[in-house]
């Protein structure tokens, strides 16, 4: 798996062959196919591993008690997400790009993203400040939109696309989006999270 990670750091997923992965790793073809049916299966394993780390990062907000200021927790979670995307950029870039051409990878990515949506919805359950702001509106489409917004902004940061080419810009815009949509307030009074 490490050889694939290293290749993804310098090559587009579509341009990497199983032969290139084998050459980089020094593994035998039979060894590769013992663990993975295809390079898509290898990417899926790398994505699951990265997303597991992402769910841990999201817990800075989703795992907080409702007594914690949610704007602080959102900013901390967004900062941890930005750090994760920076660390896992090659793998996460690859899945975003490959999902558009492979139905199994697309289904996997949608499922992985839905886990973030569901974690955020669970966090909002019983959150009085958000419930007051949302005033009876169904939070699912709002949270799903925010999840996919985050995916796109993190992806643009991973590809170093301005204006999202600095971690602070990513943290600021996503914190604003989440806190304004879910709490109706800007986090200006919050000390900025420092990029990790």
Predicted regions and their residues:
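Hydrophobic alpha-helical connector segments
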Residues: 45, 59-87, 139-146, 171
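Hydrophobic/aromatic-rich alpha-helical bundle segments in the mid-to-C-terminal region
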Residues: 97, 106, 128-176, 185-196
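Amphipathic, non-transmembrane alpha-helical scaffold segments
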Residues: 1, 43, 47, 51, ...
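Short alpha-helical functional segments enriched in proximate histidine and acidic residues
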Residues: 7, 84, 119, 123, ...
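Amphipathic alpha-helical linker/stalk segments
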Residues: 10, 46-75, 92-93, 124-126
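Short hydrophobic clusters on alpha-helical segments that form packing/core surfaces
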Residues: 3-8, 50, 81
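Helix-turn-helix
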Residues: 7-41, 45
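Short secondary-structure transition hinges
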Residues: 71-72, 76, 86-118, 133-136, ...
């Amino acid at each position: 798996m490490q050889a694939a990670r290293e290749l993804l750091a310098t090559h587009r997923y579509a341009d990497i062959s199983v032969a290139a992965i084998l050459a980089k790793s020094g593994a035998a073809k039979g060894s590769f196919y013992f663990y993975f049916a295809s390079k898509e299966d290898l990417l899926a394993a790398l994505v699951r591993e990265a997303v597991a780390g992402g769910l841990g990062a999201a817990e800075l907000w989703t795992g907080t008690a409702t007594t914690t200021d949610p704007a602080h927790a959102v900013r901390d979670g967004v900062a941890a997400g930005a750090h994760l995307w920076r660390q896992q950029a090659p793998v996460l870039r690859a899945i975003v790009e490959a999902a558009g051409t492979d139905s199994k990878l697309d289904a996997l990515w949608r499922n992985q993203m839905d886990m973030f949506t569901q974690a955020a919805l669970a966090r909002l359950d019983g959150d009085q400040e958000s419930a007051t702001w949302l005033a009876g509106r169904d939070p699912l489409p709002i949270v799903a939109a925010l999840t996919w917004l985050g995916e796109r902004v993190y992806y643009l940061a991973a590809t170093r696309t301005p204006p999202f080419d600095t971690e602070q810009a990513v943290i600021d815009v996503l914190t604003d989006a989440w806190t304004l949509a879910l709490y109706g307030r800007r986090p200006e009074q919050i000390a900025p999270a420092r990029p990790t």
